[in-house]
């Protein structure tokens, strides 16, 4: 996988109703890239798992977000849009309807987590830069 661009963050969430080694009932991955102002979405990728015969890109949800300002409502709308491409089957993990509803929730949460990761990385970078700027070389004293 390529290294994420500056102002980017990603997240992968999965719902495991039983054990950690079980297959996911629903999963969603999101990679979010902000513009230089860090107020608008420059690019986004959303992938869904366990709700179709293969992993699914939610391209319509991605298009909905590109160029939009960062708002919780936009993430919720993208989750709703992503539900349109999900084609889950009912099984012992849940009904098709339940899984489709979970897609909306997990896409929204993955986008929120990706944004939180961007902000956390920015704070860590700022703290590292501050710490580096504060360090001053120690001058050796004269020997007597």
What do these predicted ranges mean?
Residues 1-144:
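C-terminal structural segment of proteins
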């Amino acid at each position: 996988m390529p290294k994420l661009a500056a102002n980017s963050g990603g997240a992968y969430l999965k719902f495991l109703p039983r054990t950690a080694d079980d297959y996911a009932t629903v999963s969603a991955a999101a990679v979010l890239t902000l513009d230089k102002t860090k107020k608008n979405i420059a690019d986004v990728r959303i992938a869904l798992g366990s709700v179709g015969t293969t992993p699914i890109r939610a391209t319509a949800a991605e298009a909905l977000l590109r160029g939009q300002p960062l708002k919780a409502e936009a993430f919720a709308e993208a989750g709703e849009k992503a539900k349109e491409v999900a084609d889950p089957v009912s099984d012992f993990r849940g009904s098709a309807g339940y899984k489709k509803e979970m897609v909306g929730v997990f896409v929204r949460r993955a986008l929120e987590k990706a944004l939180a990761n961007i902000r956390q990385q920015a704070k860590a970078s700022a703290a590292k830069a501050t710490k580096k700027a504060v360090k001053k070389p120690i001058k050796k004293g004269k020997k007597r």
